[in-house]
């Protein structure tokens, strides 16, 4: 049996010999995007760059595009080009002109300061970034507080907080407490603006209200809690891993709710204030903090 070499066959059909051996690989071609950026001579996580970008464009009238942001980043000491700046801003929905379109009109905050006369009258929620030193990246903490008692009813700590996480959290809270008639205050984050989140709250007969842009004081209770958390826990520890950070958060939340006394509550704990609102309900008094 006569055999013909690959080179001969390739020559007959007019193809390069290398074509025979080529096997395309799955996934996108080219070099993988970098996960770190050079900052003042040291490699830092891209999450630090993203936080720097958020800070640069945080002003209420700031309309910087990615090119202006790139110039500012380089002035701060980041060794980064426009292409990478664009990619990071695009991935995190920070590009100018990225508009979140939601169905129906938003109900805006009417009164800057919330006055709650009972538990589950007002809830407020917000997202905070927590730096995990050992992994060189940020994690997201979503907390929801009962305004009357300042008690943290639920919190989520993970790599990202999506609309599905907010939906699951609201469903869990509804099963435990019944959110009918509850007013829920939040900022204008994409997770809270999502049509599915707004539709769920309508279905649960809860009322959602949005703070005005660049007015964190309208959500002052949860903002104050996150400031306390920053001062009493995050600034005092360097977390080596996600699991270590989560363990510290679990312990802190328990301590905050059940042991930390608040001057504005009359020198009692959030849980004690919560109990005052349910003098005849053992179920409401004993509800623990939910952790995910």
What are these regions (language model features)?
Residues 6-13, 69:
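Short alpha-helical "recognition helix" segments of helix-turn-helix
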Residues 19-121, 215, 269-278:
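Basic, flexible linker segments flanking DNA-binding modules
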Residues 59, 79-143, 164-172, 176-181, ...:
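Mobile-element integrase/transposase regions
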Residues 99, 184-188, 202-221, 237-242:
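RNase H-like polynucleotidyl transferase catalytic core
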Residues 115-117, 134, 215-218, 239-247:
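Conserved, non-catalytic sequence blocks in retroelement Pol enzymes and Pol-derived host proteins
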Residues 146-156, 169-172:
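Electropositive, glycine- and tryptophan-enriched low-complexity nucleic-acid-binding patches
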Residues 177-194, 216, 266-271:
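Acidic/histidine-rich, metal-coordinating catalytic segments
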Residues 195, 202-206, 228-292:
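C-terminal domain-tail junction helix/linker
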